[in-house]
Amino acid sequence: MPRSRPRVVLLRGHNANVWDLRPLERLQDEFELSALVTGSNLHRLDGLALPTVEVGSPRDKLPAGRAAGAAAYALGERYLGLEEHLRGAAVVHAAEIGTWFSAQAARLKEELGFRLVLTVWETIPWRGAYRWPRERRYRDAILPAADLLLATTGRARDALLLEDVPGERIVVSPPGVELDRFAAASGTPQDPPLLLSAGRLVWEKGHQDALRALAALHRGIGGPPRPDVRMLVLGDGPEAAKLRRYAADLGVGGAVEFRPTVPYDEMPALYRSATSLVLGSLPTRGWEEQFGMVLVEAMASGTPVVAADSGAIPEVLGAYGALVRPGDWKAMADALRAGPLGGARPAADPAVLARFSAAEAASRTRDAYRSLID
C-alpha cells in the first residue's frame, strides 16, 4: 500500500496570502496540506492551488478597519474550533513568535502531538520589555513549543538569536517566487516612462515619498524636468484617499494611476512594463521592512529598483538596485533620474535569484518538515 501523506496545517491568522503560500503547492504529492483562512483575511487568494478551510474568528463579526482590529485584539483574537482542525496533523506551520495564532497552536501542541514550525519574518528583537503584555504571553507560550523556526532572512535569524532561540532550531529559509513566470512575462518598458509603487496603501510603505519623488522629477528639482514620467500606485489600504489627494496637491494627479490589488498572475506583465519599481518603505516604532517580495519579483522581471535602505531590503536587493535613506524623496528622484530613467536595466545575479526561487523555497520547507517527522 502507498504510504499516506503526513498532514500539514498552515496557520497565518488573517494574513494568508499567495506570495507566502504558493511555493508550498509543490509539496502536495508528499504532504496533505491545507491552509486555515478566516473571514477577515486581508489578502486575495486568487490562483492559489492549495486547499483552504474557512474558519471563524471573533473579528469576522466586526466591521473592517484598524479600529475593528484593535477591538478584536482587546477581546482576544483566536480561531474558533481550532482544536478539531489540528487533530491528526503531523505538522502545524504557523508564523512569528508573538502572534495569537502561533500561541493558540503552541498551547494545543502537547495535547494533539504535532510538531510546530514557524516562519519568522520579524527583524526586530523585541524580547519582553518592548512587547505588549499579551504578546509577551504569546512569546512565552510559543518559544518553548516551537520545534523549528524558518527565518526568512539573516536579519530575522539574528533577531531570533537575540530572543534567546537556540541557533540549532533556526534555519534561514527565504520565501520563493516563480522566477520563470516573471522572466517570461510579455511586455516592455513603457514610453513615456512608468514608475511602479506596489504594496499595501499604508504610511509605512512610503507611497507618499514615491509621489514626492515623481513631483520632483516633473518640476526639475535636482536635474532637467521630466514631466513625461508617470506612476502606477498599486494596492489597497486605508491611505488610498489621502494618497489620491496628495498626488493632486503635488500637481501630479494627472500622471498617477491608482489601481487596486490585481490577481497575482497579472503582476509579471506589470513589472515588465515598468521602467522602475520604487519601494519607499519607512521604519516605524514597531516595524521595518522584513523582506520585500516585490524586490525579488522585480529582479526576476529585469525591472530596475530604487528602494529605501530599511530593514532587510539591503540583504534581499544586494547590488541589484539603488538604495536611498528612508524618507529621502530627493535622493529617490536623483537615483531614478541617474539610473532607470537614463535607460539602465541591470541583470540580476542568477545564483542570487536561484536562492529566491519557489522550487528552492519548497525544497527547504520539505527538508524542514521531514527533519521533524521522519
Locate the predicted segments by residue:
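Conserved donor-binding/catalytic core segment of Leloir-type glycosyltransferases
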Residues: 9, 186-216, 232, 277
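Conserved acidic donor-binding segment of nucleotide-sugar-dependent glycosyltransferases
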Residues: 105, 309, 319-329, 336-343
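Carbohydrate-associated surface elements
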Residues: 155, 176
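Short alpha-helical donor nucleotide-sugar binding micro-motif in glycosyltransferases
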Residues: 86, 143, 261-262, 269-274
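Nucleotide-activated donor-binding/catalytic signature segment of Leloir-type glycosyltransferases, i.e.
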Residues: 241-262
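A short, histidine- and acid-enriched strand-loop-helix "catalytic/donor-clamping" loop
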Residues: 15-16, 100, 114-133, 145-148
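Acidic donor-binding loop of glycosyltransferase active sites
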Residues: 272-287, 303
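Short hydrophobic beta-strand element within catalytic cores of glycosyltransferases
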Residues: 295-307
